[in-house]
Regions:
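Interaction-mediating elements
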Residues: 1-111
């Protein structure tokens, strides 16, 4: 029996998170979105990535930690890389996009 897993992250800004997902080839949908799991179960997230073979990815804001949590049904994970590797790549892209955004807002130009 599958169930949704909630993974705490340090992802705190929406724009770099969306850009990181896009950089990795995903198409995130913003706003209150359903995240599909086992046998049609759903949870609501602030940002979602629909996966063709089920097991959507969702991100919902946790006000207590001031960060987004990743919500997915890990039993339905069917991507080409393990979940842990995906999360590592997402975090790396997020960090890069956060630095680029901060540099741009400070007036630096990145080539």
């Amino acid at each position: 029996m599958s169930h949704f897993s909630t993974v705490k992250t340090e992802l705190r800004q929406l724009e770099p998170l969306v850009q990181a997902l896009e950089d990795l080839g995903y198409t995130p949908d913003q706003g209150s979105q359903p995240v599909r799991g086992y046998r049609g179960q759903t949870v609501t997230a602030d940002l979602a990535v629909a996966m063709d073979d089920g097991g959507d990815l969702g991100f919902r804001w946790n006000a207590q930690t001031a960060a987004y949590e990743l919500v997915t049904d890990l039993d339905l994970w069917k991507q080409s890389i393990p979940f842990e590797r995906f999360l590592s790549k997402l975090t790396q892209r997020y960090a890069l996009n956060t630095v680029l955004k901060a540099s741009d807002s400070e007036g630096f130009q990145v080539a």
